[in-house]
């Protein structure tokens, strides 16, 4: 630390015109207080006769909203839905809405807490087939399902009519002793139905695999918990029990 002939005022940086190096001072801004506590630490530097200020970090402050428990997923209180404490987490991470937890367990396809690894008692129910037909997943899977359904509805009657006409032609040729033409029409009918059945089988297996995967990862989760885990809305959270211990001022020169 160097000294020079400079005038010092409270909370004002030294006015040193002879020093070329910038002077840095870190103070806690007390202009905006919450319950007598500063809200953030501001770094003030002087360079070329100009003051430059930067917020270094914010300080944890207590507010009336922190005294009420809230859901750790949606950060909402218990006004719309009761809060639960179904796992071993404590403090602000220990309360959660039942619907939020069930939605998270369904989306993540897990049955335990990601923080304390407590395993929940859940009941999983598969979703109906109609819901998968409405929303099978990504956009390319929707296009594939829609295209295959249209092709199936269009090709099935076309293949049936074509096969029937070929067989009728083969029977007529047999009556007129045209065995070569009859054999050709029968072979064409067999090839037509073979290609149709092969395409139908491959498409059906592909969509069955997608449906089974969707059904496994998109189950309806029902949380099985006792009623004793409900958290009253007037119970203060553990965050309000811990006081914020900060120095009133930090100075670095």
UniProtKB/Swiss-Prot annotation:
Binding site for Zn(2+) 1: 71, 74, 97, 100
Gene Ontology molecular function terms on file: ubiquitin-protein transferase activity; zinc ion binding
Enzyme class: transferase
PROSITE patterns: ZF_RING_CH
Modified residue annotations for Phosphoserine: 237, 243
Domain of life: Eukaryota
Transmembrane segments: 145-165, 182-202
Subcellular localization(s) per the UniProt record: Cytoplasmic vesicle membrane; Early endosome membrane
Catalysed conversion reaction: S-ubiquitinyl-[E2 ubiquitin-conjugating enzyme]-L-cysteine + [acceptor protein]-L-lysine = [E2 ubiquitin-conjugating enzyme]-L-cysteine + N(6)-ubiquitinyl-[acceptor protein]-L-lysine
Subunit structure: Interacts with MARCHF2 and STX6.
Name under which the protein is recorded: E3 ubiquitin-protein ligase MARCHF3
Taxonomy of the source species: Eukaryota, Metazoa, Chordata, Craniata, Vertebrata
Encoding gene (name): MARCHF3
